[in-house]
Amino acid sequence: MTSVYHTPVLLEESVRLLDIDPAGTYVDLTFGGGGHSRRILSALGDRGRLYAFDQDRDTRDNCPEDSRFHYVESNFRFMRGALRLRGVTRVDGILADLGVSSHHFDAVERGFSFRGSAPLDMRMNQRGGGTAADLVNTLDADALTRILGDWGEIDTPWKVAACIVRARTAQPILTTADLVAAVAPCTPKKDESKFLTKLFQALRIEVNGEMEALKMALEQSLKVLRPGGRLVVISYHSLEDRLVKNFLRSGNFEGRIEKDFFGKPETPFEIITRKAVTPVSYTHLPSPRDKRQP
């Protein structure tokens, strides 16, 4: 199965910025095909440890046979609790490669791609939870409008929601092809791929609770990282980008800078740039796959 996973974007850059201590403890929040984990392991010594999270059971087949490696089959929103169960309270670095992997787009049967026809699933964790088909067939127009506007940043989400509601009254929307056909009346011909990318992104984020999971992981990172530890995040779209930047610059998701008694800004992280590396660090790396279409 490993062969169907592509080489991670910014592999060397992201691992280099972790500044790995060979005897340190590290977390890969998004194991996937294991590319980042294998690169981290190559920099660790015999005493080093790596904990890799993924809620998609398919990824278990990619686990390396290495006593320093510990696979955690869980959503990364439960990072702190899962680590504590394994006797880990502090780590030296955390890496997160956000969003959906190229494997999920390529595995058409999972329903992440609008190319072809497959069950409208979109669950990262296929063992439970509602599917994208459940959303589009049961939610009212107002709820669909919110999802499409908030998570897809679609210009006229109410029109798209109306198309979906109208189509499902004739027959259930069960496949990716059904959904593409349902929104055809409101799909701009000139920007069809861009529009469908936003539509599928919105539903995927809602199905998997991606933004809430990201918030929880970021908040927990403050309690899990040792002083001097590093958090490296690769993001793919503007929603993740804003959320991560706000939190790392201000310690909250609104971007509100708090000040101490003397008027000095209180920020939980210092930003890494290519010209300066600080003891407690964060780097935000925009990915070339920002514009990748499902």
Model regions: which residues?
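S-adenosyl-L-methionine-dependent methyltransferase catalytic core, i.e., the SAM/SAH-binding region
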Residues: 1-289
